[in-house]
């Protein structure tokens, strides 16, 4: 391969060009420039790169291609191009890491729930392994709908405190024609041993022989997590449905059971935010 160098009086260098248009002008239709390949140990450590004139830290604007991955949890580096600027190596590529986990049983009924703990398929003994060390945004999206409300022949409005949650159920009965019942429960997302709880509430109605149920309500919960690259974090999600005597079979069987993920599944999304 013939390489042509051009040196002008004002110190311009051209490679494969006789008319360089900058201090250094490299011309090739098939090849690129290979930056020095080094094994960095941390973003805030200059070594093994040094300034060849002083033997000290490199000057701002020094480029290298890092070949290593660290996973200390602080100032980690990953393979790619870096520039030294203000006493640290700054990555010259976008750090992007995202993963979505979804409820696996979905559709017209989703998961039918009973009183007490209900494991949610798709969130049973799962793991997430981050690509980078730093802050991740975890968004948990859940939805829940109640089962059949009971028929009631009397007119009244009552409030009942659920001992499991401290929340009040509101029940409205209007003759034998109309019954509105609030059904509730709580999602628990356990990530790496820490619980994140999301309260859920839904209304079921009975009106002159017409039933409205599985009227699901969607809610979200956002948490920011400091994670270490390459470490596998365990997580699970369950739903605890509270007993309600105004739902058929107390909500524990048959048409009184609740609904999770009707047509739209519950999901959890991890997104890398920053170092």
Identify the residue ranges that each predicted region occupies.
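N-terminal signal peptide c-region/cleavage motif recognized by signal peptidases
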Residues: 6-10
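N-terminal start-of-chain detector that recognizes signal peptides
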Residues: 4-5, 52-54, 206-208
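C-terminal trimerization/auto-chaperone modules of long, extracellular attachment fibers and adhesins
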Residues: 1, 12-126, 259-263
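Short non-domain terminal segments
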Residues: 3-5, 63, 185-189
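Extracellular jelly-roll beta-sandwich "head" domains, especially the C-terminal globular C1q domain
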Residues: 94-275
């Amino acid at each position: 391969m013939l390489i042509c160098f051009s040196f002008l009086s004002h110190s311009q260098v051209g490679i494969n060009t006789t008319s360089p248009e900058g201090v250094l002008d490299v011309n090739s239709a098939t090849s690129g420039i290979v930056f020095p390949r080094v094994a960095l140990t941390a973003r805030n450590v200059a070594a093994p790169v040094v300034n060849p004139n002083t033997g000290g830290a490199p000057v701002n604007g020094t480029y290298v291609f890092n070949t290593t991955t660290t996973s200390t949890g602080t100032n980690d580096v990953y393979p790619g191009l870096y520039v030294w600027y203000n006493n640290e190596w700054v990555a010259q590529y976008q750090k992007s890491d995202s993963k979505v986990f979804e409820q696996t049983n979905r559709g017209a009924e989703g998961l039918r729930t009973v009183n007490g703990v209900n494991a949610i398929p798709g969130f049973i003994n799962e793991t997430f392994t981050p690509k980078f060390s730093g802050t991740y945004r975890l968004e948990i999206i859940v939805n829940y709908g109640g089962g059949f409300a009971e028929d009631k022949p009397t007119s009244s409005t009552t409030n009942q405190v659920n001992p499991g949650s401290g929340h009040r159920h509101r029940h409205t009965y209007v003759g034998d024609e109309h019954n509105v019942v609030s059904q509730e429960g709580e999602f628990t997302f356990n990530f790496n041993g820490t619980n994140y709880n999301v309260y859920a509430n839904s209304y079921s109605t009975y009106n002159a022989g017409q039933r409205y149920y599985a009227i699901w309500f969607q809610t979200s919960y956002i948490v920011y997590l400091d994670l270490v690259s390459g470490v596998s974090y365990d997580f699970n999600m369950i739903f605890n449905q509270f007993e309600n005597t105004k739902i058929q079979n107390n909500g524990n069987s048959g048409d009184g059971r609740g609904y999770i993920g009707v047509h739209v599944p519950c999901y959890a999304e991890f997104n890398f935010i920053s170092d």
